[in-house]
Regions:
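C-terminal substrate-binding/active-site "lid" region of AdoMet-derived donor-dependent transferases
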Residues: 1-132
Length: 132
């Protein structure tokens, strides 16, 4: 976890950071276990939430989400975390992709069309006024 925090900021824009041997996160002899919340695998799962931060950030601060991994009040620099564009898992491996320079954050401009919102009216606030 600390290695990721120290080195991800040095990954070039559009580059990838690979974490291997994640099976150790599940093996008790290596300090792991499926129910342990402090493993590298659990930290990387939280990075998937960081990618989707625009949808939950009003409810919780990103540092609060990651706090269990930084005891004693240590605070990671979250600046480079904003550049995470994807977190992909493979057998015993995770690939974290850094946003390319100049790439649009998230999915791009939100476009909502239509005038009815039968479940929630919230999306109508984002209704596009441009013509297609």
């Amino acid at each position: 976890v600390l290695t990721f925090c120290n080195y991800f900021r040095h990954v070039n824009s559009g580059g990838t950071y690979v974490v291997e041997d994640l099976h150790c996160s599940y093996l008790p002899r290596w300090g792991g276990g499926i129910d342990r919340g402090d493993t590298s695998m659990e930290f990387l799962k939280l990075l998937a939430d960081v990618v989707n931060q625009p949808y939950w950030q009003r409810e919780r601060e990103p540092l609060a989400l990651l706090a269990p991994f930084f005891p004693g009040g240590a605070r990671p620099d979250l600046t480079s975390f904003r550049d995470i564009v994807s977190v992909t898992f493979y057998d015993s491996m995770c690939v974290v992709e850094k946003r390319a320079q100049g790439a649009v954050d998230g999915l791009g401009e939100r476009v909502v069309v239509g005038t009815e919102a039968s479940v929630s009216t919230d999306p109508l606030a984002h209704r596009s006024t441009r013509q297609s």
